[in-house]
Design a protein with these regions (language model features):
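Conserved phosphate/metal-binding and DNA-contacting active-site motifs used
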Residues: 1-165
Length: 165
């Protein structure tokens, strides 16, 4: 039996929810294409979560201080953290962290003054940081030790960006 998705109130209160296709195409609750830069294509959580369009949910980042760090392919069997990601996961402050739809990645959500997007590798592993004009798939499947709040990630993001140098 699947656990009910859990999302921080700070995300639930924002009308920036969309649906997504199996291929991660952003969709409106009507089934038409959504856009990460066109707010009229976004919905409330209630509307998006009750829609049967597509295969899941997404949340749009619009530069208002919400940031997501995406660690690609960092989880192995039984959610064992890959060597390349172990130090990163150990540095995560008490914030909302969810397992990605693939089951082998993590989305680290929080607040930050970071603007834009950045993609880089750390010891061969993929790291992405986004705060605007982007949507991320959402599962609500909390990773071990995750909280239900969005913490300040400024220091964490700064530390990650130093790893990218």
């Amino acid at each position: 039996m699947n656990a009910r998705p859990v999302f921080p109130v700070e995300l639930l209160e924002r009308d920036r929810w969309i649906r997504r296709s199996v291929d991660k195409v952003p969709l409106q609750v009507s089934g038409r294409n959504a856009s990460s830069t066109a707010s009229q294509t976004w919905s409330s959580y209630a509307a998006a979560s009750s829609s049967s369009v597509g295969t899941g949910l997404g949340f749009v980042l619009n530069g208002d201080g919400i940031v997501c760090v995406d660690l690609d392919h960092c989880l192995g069997e039984s959610s064992v953290v890959a060597d390349w990601a172990r130090e990163i996961v150990g540095q995560i402050p008490g914030t909302f962290v969810e397992v990605s739809p693939s089951g082998d990645g993590l989305h680290i959500w929080g607040r930050s003054s970071f603007q834009g997007g950045r993609r880089f590798t750390v010891d061969g592993g993929g790291v992405e940081i986004y705060s605007t004009a982007r949507y991320l798939t959402m599962t609500g499947r909390k990773f071990e030790g995750s909280t239900d709040v969005l913490a300040d990630l400024d220091e964490f993001v700064e530390w990650l960006l130093e790893l990218a140098l």
